[in-house]
């Protein structure tokens, strides 16, 4: 380090430490980027800046990494631990000679030629001092200090003063110089290539972190009104409604004003501070997984479309906060028009929300304006977010997808976007959903409460510790790749006004796949596991030891037979998870001489079905296998596989399960092996039997799927009893029988009486060929499926269903 740098560091030490508050991404680069502290590390930065280097030094010290000022000695040579591509521009006069970064890269590569064991990790680091992207229509100015990408020393000093508290240090995955040297050599041309790659990388990092300039609403409205598509729609509206062109244009402008967001970076910054406080007050923390792959896609220039599940109004705030906190650009969010009330509407709008009506039916001008607005967002490169379920789930299960926004996304892509479009499924989970009581009332038949300021105040008044929140980014789905594989001719239809025939079925398939990938990113926690166990128990009560043992059973199943590489399982043991769940005060706990008993009263049991349903899909197949063994002792492996294959299509559609049919034999084998390892079952005489020592644990596992199988049995036996029944009547009779079962046998799960589930089941029976389009049944297949499902129910449930079918 030069004498000048030492003097600068000494002078700036106190100002920088007082003004700069850095945040690193990822939070643990050693683990998340697989950095090897035992191998030499050299940092690559875009611009030589003493404040950047000092900030990086402090950040590295906090993370346990060698800092840029830490000496690096290799083969007896003392080398700088950082390489910078550019000097800052001078205050006056011409730019001084360039930095010797090519020689430095070449020197590092040449060391690998001399020492075959050497492997230097080059870690690109980007420092952001604020992430305001600017706004369209703003004039570029030399005095625009904050947005300057190459500030001189005076500007940099002002940036540190004004934006030091917003500093973000972004570490990128390391580049192995050993790999580079072995594959490409060590001559000067490779050093040039390395420098070019680094420049491209830093440019993409800047765009991924700040995004394109924010839209200017007035300019945006003018662009929309000047478009040929909207001009034509205005003319058609005037003719259809018998009004003047001026009035029709004013109506179109009103729709734009109703729809369009008014993104404010200042609000995003204030929101980050407020929401950081809110999460600490509301929750014990946030768990975020899978963000790195999304950052990588953004950096590669993908159009990112976030597709989260919808649990709560809190989802809007949570996901935008997490995306910004993870160093990415908050998206424009499609929000229901019901949220456009004061003061939430203006706040959401400044936070990126654009508002959508429940239906476009009967209003072609509104439909055209909305579609063109969405097309413009994509064309300008803004990320977008929409909830494909269309509304919040009242039961904790994923709802059947609404395909409108997905279809419009695909149509926008077919307008000829010049970059890949990637859909990112997002699983949002909570240990407490603040609207869950309201959901229960709505499912009982109460009218949905209209969103209002008073409702917001009511929620804020109840703020308390709600446990943890979970945001898991699932497996991304790049539309271009999907269409290349499934619709090879799709590019031939780019720019066409008419929708191609393949559009509708492709959108439906994409929607199903997205829902499956959302469920594949599920987050397991102590509350959801405890709810699963207690709701499976007789009278919803277990001793604490039994409950803890059951949590162990669930955890071992998830670890030994993972549902998906994107789902997350807690690191804590069963005891710790149970302690955390009990702190949420959702259970009754009593104690006698033998120990604690954990139970649920009737109301708690109903509310906890919501949390159980968040993870029910993870245990659907383990529960089915357990039920087959528990009800059909001595059953063979081949019979288990055959029955699972027979029942699976119904479960797959209802719970958005990820397995294909040809994967089921291998899955069944893995589950049988794990159940034997846990000593829940025994294999003998060519079959599988319940291990009486651990019968309770197997019974609890088997019980989780019972309510689902009961619904299937209701419909199957009803069709067998009345083969000529119409679809609507079958749905109504199924719902009536479910309510009867609930009354007689104390089944309180709200989704047990959910008409949508009966509708989904009948649709699946049609698509699988059990029913023809006119609802005429294939009685042979119905009987075979009923023979596989009905014996898995308890005797009392079977009798009630049989009695109902005789009425």
Curated annotation (Swiss-Prot):
It is a peripheral membrane protein. Keywords: Acyltransferase, Cell inner membrane, Cell membrane, Lipid biosynthesis, Lipid metabolism, Membrane, Phospholipid biosynthesis, Phospholipid metabolism, Transferase. GO terms for biological process: CDP-diacylglycerol biosynthetic process; fatty acid metabolic process. It comes from the Bacteria. A motif (HXXXXD motif) lies at residues 309-314. It is found in: Cell inner membrane. The keyword Iron-sulfur does not apply. Pathway: Phospholipid metabolism; CDP-diacylglycerol biosynthesis; CDP-diacylglycerol from sn-glycerol 3-phosphate: step 1/3. This is Glycerol-3-phosphate acyltransferase. It comes from Aeromonas hydrophila subsp. hydrophila (strain ATCC 7966 / DSM 30187 / BCRC 13018 / CCUG 14551 / JCM 1027 / KCTC 2358 / NCIMB 9240 / NCTC 8049).
